Design a protein with these regions (language model features):
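Active-site bordering "gate/hinge" segments
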Residues: 1-276
């Protein structure tokens, strides 16, 4: 059943239950991943996931919400009925409405459609990559952490007001983490990650080279002289700091009263002058 058919199914079920206002968000995905250990398959995984989150408004305009993975006719009716029952316990202090952007088209960068290569092909590619990485330098003794995966997913939103938005995407990732050992030196490890829309987009040779060079470079270590050093933080480090305190400006946390901020905090400083 595709997303259009699911939307039609939900609409019919809502009419049957006499539910006038509803919306739903859905996520469908197919994931494949492999790991190897010295040429042998260590882990092979394939999964198919589907989850629907449905909201129903009652006559008092209170919202009830439920989730389900059962997209059969009976499963959808049951989920809508549960959301309708839950709406009786909706928060009267928060009146939720459809987003004004619900009917706007989603701007998605066009990309060539990728197809799954399958578990067997993933395993073959990763085995070859492991062998090449081990052969790239005599000091690299193992590749303890590695993985090759591909995911294909679809996101959908639709409501009783006629909105329907969806997009499909794919992604693939290769991860190689090598361990090098030399006499009278501590073992050192490093790795590399490459991403792409599909496995065919990943530069496998570059990933092998990066993992090898980084790992070997770590063997040439020496102690750092105790002294005072000027440290320059990257822009990303400040984003990490802000993310660590994200509850300060998370809307849900503010509404629930578990944030240091409140509804009147807009415009106030978040940091000290030293960080500014």
């Amino acid at each position: 059943m595709n997303s259009k058919e699911i939307t039609t199914q939900i609409s019919k079920a809502a009419d049957f239950l006499n539910l006038k206002k509803w919306d739903y968000g859905a996520s469908f995905s197919n994931d494949y991943s492999v790991q190897v250990d010295k040429g042998e398959a260590k882990q092979l995984k394939a999964s198919q996931k589907q989850i629907l989150t449905l909201r129903v408004w009652n006559e008092s305009n209170l919202v009830g919400i439920t989730t389900t993975s059962d997209i059969s006719e009976s499963g959808i009716k049951k989920a809508l009925n549960q959301a309708n029952i839950a709406s009786d316990f909706g928060n009267k202090n928060e009146r939720t409405e459809f987003s004004p952007l619900a009917k706007d088209p989603i701007e998605v960068k066009d990309a060539k459609k990728r197809n799954p290569v399958g578990i067997k092909k993933l395993l073959t590619i990763l085995r070859e990559a492991e062998v090449k990485l081990l052969e790239s330098h005599e000091s690299i003794k193992s590749v303890p952490y590695n993985g090759l995966s591909e995911s294909f997913y679809e996101r959908v939103y639709a409501n009783s007001d006629g909105a329907f938005r969806s997009y499909t995407k794919s992604q693939a990732a290769l991860y190689l983490y090598a361990r090098a050992e030399e006499k009278n030196k501590k073992p050192r490890s490093s790795g590399s990650v490459k991403l792409g829309y599909g496995v065919e987009d990943i530069d496998i040779e570059s990933c092998i080279k990066d993992a090898s060079n980084k790992t070997i470079s770590h063997l040439n270590y020496s102690s750092i002289k105790t002294d005072k050093y000027l440290i320059c933080f990257s822009p990303e480090s400040f984003l990490t700091i802000i993310n660590a305190f994200s509850s300060m400006f998370n809307a849900r946390s503010i509404l629930d009263g578990v944030s240091l901020s409140n509804k009147n905090s807009i415009g106030e400083k978040l940091s000290t002058e030293a960080l500014n």
